Amino acid sequence: MNYFPIFANLAGRPVLVVGGGSVAARKISLLLDAGAQVRVVANQLNAELSALAAENKILWLAEEFRAEHIRTVFLIIAASSDQALNRRVFQLAESCQKPVNVVDDRDYCSFIFPSIINRNPIQIAVSSSGSAPVLARLLREKLEALLPHSLGDMAEISGRWRDAVKAKLKSVTERRRFWEKQFNGRFAALVKNQQTAQAEQELAKQLEQNYQGGFVSLVGAGPGDAGLLTLKGLQEIQQADVVLYDALVSDGILSLVRRDAERIFVGKRARGDRTPQEDTNALMVRLAREGRRVVRLKGGDPFVFGRGGEELETLARHQIPFSVVPGITAAVGATAYAGIPLTHRDYAQSAVFVTGHRKADAPDIEWQTLARSRQTLVIYMGALKAALIAERLQQHGRSPDTPAAVISQGTLPAQKTATGTLANLAELAETAPNPALIVIGEVVGLHEKLAWFGENGEGENRVGQAYPALGGLNAGQRAA
């Protein structure tokens, strides 16, 4: 972090600006908006600043800059056209340990100005630490388009209601949960539509009826890449009091969890320690009964070999309210990143997902169905049984020459895709790090041509990177 982001209270504080031209005027406009008492040292002022001086909105010191000018001010901005003067201002300010900014000269600044999105009292600052000001400006423009102007009104109304909410809801957790609900509900919609009176009535109603019970949200984290987490999933993990996560949730996803939320690992791996499912179920119920907002965060999609159905049955049995946020399952995400289409008009008219890890008393797999040609077979948690899988498929008619792949660490920077055939599937799986996904079918043969991501991305049709910069800052921009 090159610069520490901080918001300064300038209301009523003296600020010195050296320079009387258009550059100085732009900074002075911001300072006046913040309530600063602006002193301008310059021999001449442009028309805009002259008008401000005539209206007594700024104090004009029509003289040469002197060291005495900086001694009684809070911060200093050098914005003259004289580079030598600007640098002298910097040196004197530094010697007095006063914050100083020389406009457009980063080496002579103890602080810099960010790009600002103003939804007063909500303010958002964007900075590239002076490295790429145009990029920071483009980001600001993108955020300006995304953020409704009603945010400021929403914040002002909320400020008026803070004391009432605090009196009604005693704990910080209760108050946070209440406001999260309002900012994502009907109150926010009313404010956006300029219906202020109705919005305040809605707040009063919600405060009176505020539900204090717990809640569980079953959230699919996707296959690993944090960029594949859904927007709804992100909202849920940033509103959680506690997150129960498994071993397939990547560090990138966990870094998005609200910082003060409790995180509890409840994962399991085929070769390692495991948290019994019954313990996880009981923990969800207990935490919800304590009135906490719980997120059960599961790799991939919670309803695709994630035992999500079993967990919801437990919650329903104990009358715990819940919701489900789907995620991108590994079979979809990992194969896409490996350049292996699950279906293709020339090679596969169907795709079948199956688990390689079954309950001990589960009925036998229908191998005849899985061995059909012109379909893609994706096997979760099958690496340890790869030899048996290959043997059974061949026994039921699948050719030993059928292309096969083992994808490890799918969608993550460490992703590896090992390809071969059904005949040597066991060898491919033996050296593959977990978590690994097995893909069998003619579509695997397209990997070499379509691979685009990571160290395997050497296909002849590779077109750049996973994400064009910022998704294309300009509408319609695509990878070249």
Swiss-Prot record:
Binding site residues for S-adenosyl-L-methionine: 223, 299-301, 304, 329-330, 381, 410
InterPro entries referenced in this protein's UniProt entry, alphabetically: 4pyrrol_Mease, 4pyrrol_Methylase_sf, 4pyrrole_Mease_sub1, 4pyrrole_Mease_sub2, CobA/CysG_C, NAD(P)-bd_dom_sf, Siro_Cobalamin_biosynth, Sirohaem_synt_dimer_dom_sf
Record-level GO BP terms: cobalamin biosynthetic process; methylation; siroheme biosynthetic process
UniProt cross-references to PROSITE patterns, sorted A to Z: SUMT_1, SUMT_2
Catalyzed reactions: uroporphyrinogen III + 2 S-adenosyl-L-methionine = precorrin-2 + 2 S-adenosyl-L-homocysteine + H(+); precorrin-2 + NAD(+) = sirohydrochlorin + NADH + 2 H(+); siroheme + 2 H(+) = sirohydrochlorin + Fe(2+)
Catalytic residues in the record: 246, 268
Binding site for NAD(+): 22-23, 43-44
Chain positions covered by the region annotation Precorrin-2 dehydrogenase /sirohydrochlorin ferrochelatase: 1-203
Pathway given in the UniProt record: Cofactor biosynthesis; adenosylcobalamin biosynthesis; precorrin-2 from uroporphyrinogen III: step 1/1; Cofactor biosynthesis; adenosylcobalamin biosynthesis; sirohydrochlorin from precorrin-2: step 1/1; Porphyrin-containing compound metabolism; siroheme biosynthesis; precorrin-2 from uroporphyrinogen III: step 1/1; Porphyrin-containing compound metabolism; siroheme biosynthesis; siroheme from sirohydrochlorin: step 1/1
Highest taxon of the lineage: Bacteria
Its EC number(s): 2.1.1.107, 1.3.1.76, 4.99.1.4
Modified residues (Phosphoserine): 128
NCBIfam families: cobA_cysG_Cterm (TIGR01469), cysG_Nterm (TIGR01470), PRK06136.1 (NF004790), PRK10637.1 (NF007922)
Classification via PANTHER family: SIROHEME SYNTHASE, SIROHEME SYNTHASE-RELATED
Family per similarity comment: In the N-terminal section; belongs to the precorrin-2 dehydrogenase / sirohydrochlorin ferrochelatase family. In the C-terminal section; belongs to the precorrin methyltransferase family.
Its job: Then it catalyzes the NAD-dependent ring dehydrogenation of precorrin-2 to yield sirohydrochlorin. Finally, it catalyzes the ferrochelation of sirohydrochlorin to yield siroheme.
Protein known as: Siroheme synthase
